[in-house]
């Protein structure tokens, strides 16, 4: 039954399975003044979905490095900035660039590029040419981060 569900989810396209955006099309974006000012999707991001993605240990995995405000999960990370007040510290444009490719902001960042498929290192064959999150998932997480005031 579980395999049937996974097959159905994959056939829908753009569904995240084990943290990978299966069948996610890449969209062009432009970096301007340290951010990506234009959303990756026409549909606005949904903050509730964004929080679900960020706190899911099989999808966003943000809590591996960050502490998430309001989360009761044990073993949240402390090697990256606490996400409280993210919407006050950064604009949606800046947050979008950090999600898409954090190394464009800080070349030494260990944060994965969630919406990048080229110039990556040590990517398993089954995960090549696929972003970690699809464009809508990135926009959802950005909407959630912006809401953290």
Region locations from a protein language model:
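An acidic site on a long C-lobe helix of protein kinase domains
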Residues: 46, 91, 133-137
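Protein kinase-like catalytic domain
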Residues: 66-69, 145-149
């Amino acid at each position: 039954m579980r395999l049937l569900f996974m097959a159905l989810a994959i056939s829908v396209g753009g569904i995240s399975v084990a943290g990978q955006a299966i069948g996610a099309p890449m969209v062009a974006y432009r970096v301007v003044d340290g951010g990506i000012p234009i959303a990756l999707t026409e549909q606005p991001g949904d903050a509730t979905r964004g929080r679900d993605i960020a706190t899911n240990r099989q999808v966003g995995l943000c809590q591996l490095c960050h502490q998430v405000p309001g989360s009761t999960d044990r073993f949240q990370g402390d090697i990256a900035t606490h996400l409280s007040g993210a919407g006050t510290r950064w604009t949606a444009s800046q947050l979008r660039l950090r999600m898409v490719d954090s190394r464009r902001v800080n070349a030494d960042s260990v944060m994965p590029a969630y919406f990048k498929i080229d110039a990556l290192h040590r990517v398993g064959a089954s995960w090549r040419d696929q972003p970690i999150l699809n464009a809508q998932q990135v926009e959802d997480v950005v909407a959630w981060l912006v809401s953290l005031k």
